[in-house]
UniProtKB/Swiss-Prot annotation:
Residues 42-61 have a biased composition (Basic and acidic residues). This is Small ribosomal subunit protein bS18. It comes from Anaeromyxobacter dehalogenans (strain 2CP-C). GO terms for biological process: translation. InterPro entries: Ribosomal_bS18 (IPR001648), Ribosomal_bS18_sf (IPR036870). Residues 9-41 have a biased composition (Gly residues). It comes from the Bacteria. Residues 1-65 are annotated as: Disordered. The keyword Ribosomal protein applies. Keywords: Ribonucleoprotein, Ribosomal protein, RNA-binding, rRNA-binding. The gene is rpsR. Pfam families: Ribosomal_S18. One of its GO terms (cellular component) is cytosolic small ribosomal subunit. Part of the 30S ribosomal subunit. Forms a tight heterodimer with protein bS6.
Length: 135
């Protein structure tokens, strides 16, 4: 519903009233460059087509997501999360020293919490870096 003070679709629309010349211009005129920036409701998006008519992959079926990652600590029960093992902990850090998220590392929730705690312990003991120095 159009507000009377803002000039709705019948008045020229847009932001700032019927003759403001601000953003908008109601579906056709005024505003920045004519076409209207957030003006009236009709016509501006008609040439886009429906979502299902936009093209893209026509094959259907499965997308190529690849293999599901398995938590390395659950798969190999002999592996333990150890903050003193710098090589193992560096695997879960980016080049900038940030902890790699679970969806990328493939850890389960339990072991991701353990890894994060171990990395934070290693940082406190100066085994692992908080950040990498800028050049």
């Amino acid at each position: 519903m159009a507000r009377p003070d803002m000039g709705g679709p019948k008045m020229g629309g847009g932001f700032g009233g019927p003759r403001s010349g601000g953003f908008g211009g109601g579906g056709g005129g005024g505003g920045f460059g004519g076409g209207g920036f957030g003006g009236g409701r009709g016509g501006d998006r008609g040439d886009r087509g429906d979502r299902d008519d936009r093209g893209g992959d026509e094959g259907g079926g499965r997308r190529g997501f690849g293999r599901r990652k398995v938590c390395r600590f659950c798969a190999d029960k002999t592996l333990k999360v150890d903050y003193k093992d710098q090589g193992q902990m560096k695997y879960f850090l980016t080049e900038r020293g940030k902890i790699i998220p679970r969806r990328i590392s493939g850890n389960c929730a339990k072991h991701q919490r353990e890894v994060a705690t171990a990395i934070k312990r290693g940082r406190m003991l100066a085994i692992l870096p908080y950040t990498v120095g800028q050049m």
